[in-house]
Amino acid sequence: MKKVLITGFEPFGGDAINPALEAVKRLEETSLDGGIIVTCQVPVTRFESISAVIDAIEAYQPDCVITVGQAAGRAAITPERVAINVDDFRIPDNGGNQPIDEPIIEQGPDAYFSSLPIKRIAQTLHESGIPCQVSNSAGTFVCNHLFYGVQHYLRDKSIRHGFVHIPLLPEQATDGNHPSMSLDMIVAGLKLVAQVVIDHESDVVVSGGQIC
């Protein structure tokens, strides 16, 4: 039986909730076809976030890791293609850190690509009625920081990993200026992501790019 670690960030930026954390609470010990989901909570703090996930990886010894964070402004679940080696925080993280144009890993590669079948994920969720599309930018805040840091840690290991952004919850989008997604749909989507990941190592050859 395969084990999938799904991680969720704590609230940040003045929000009382984070849909990533709310989703992983529901997903803990969820059974998959041929697998099980384990979870962990991640601080929205530079470097501490990476350490928390590494600790969980070493404790659970998963086959795959899916790190998850919220993305205000996105209407779909978005598996990320690439993490870049730069921290450029528009706001401070929960530890008060606000690096500008600093590398995450000194002398590290410029970027790491997801090792998950991101296009197959997008295709499968879309066919299941859950909005999903590939994203080509994970930003430069703690989500990208974690994505890059975990990929760096796993660079010589057989554990596959990728980052997935999810929309805000309806209760976070009351101003009417941001799209949202119900927690039930987010949970269903992430469970399906996990199933795709354990079922498929290779991706489908379809367009997932954007003009700009």
From Swiss-Prot:
GO terms for biological process: proteolysis. The active site is at E80, C143, H165. Signal peptide: none annotated. It catalyses: Release of an N-terminal pyroglutamyl group from a polypeptide, the second amino acid generally not being Pro. It comes from the Bacteria. Its EC number is 3.4.19.3. It is found in: Cytoplasm. Keywords: Cytoplasm, Hydrolase, Protease, Thiol protease. InterPro entries: Peptidase_C15, Peptidase_C15-like, Peptidase_C15-like_sf, PGP-I_bact-type, PGPEP1_Cys_AS, PGPEP1_Glu_AS. The keyword Hydrolase applies. One of its GO terms (cellular component) is cytosol. GO terms for molecular function: pyroglutamyl-peptidase activity. Homotetramer. Belongs to the peptidase C15 family. Removes 5-oxoproline from various penultimate amino acid residues except L-proline. This is Pyrrolidone-carboxylate peptidase. It comes from Vibrio parahaemolyticus serotype O3:K6 (strain RIMD 2210633). The lineage of its organism: Bacteria, Pseudomonadati, Pseudomonadota, Gammaproteobacteria, Vibrionales.
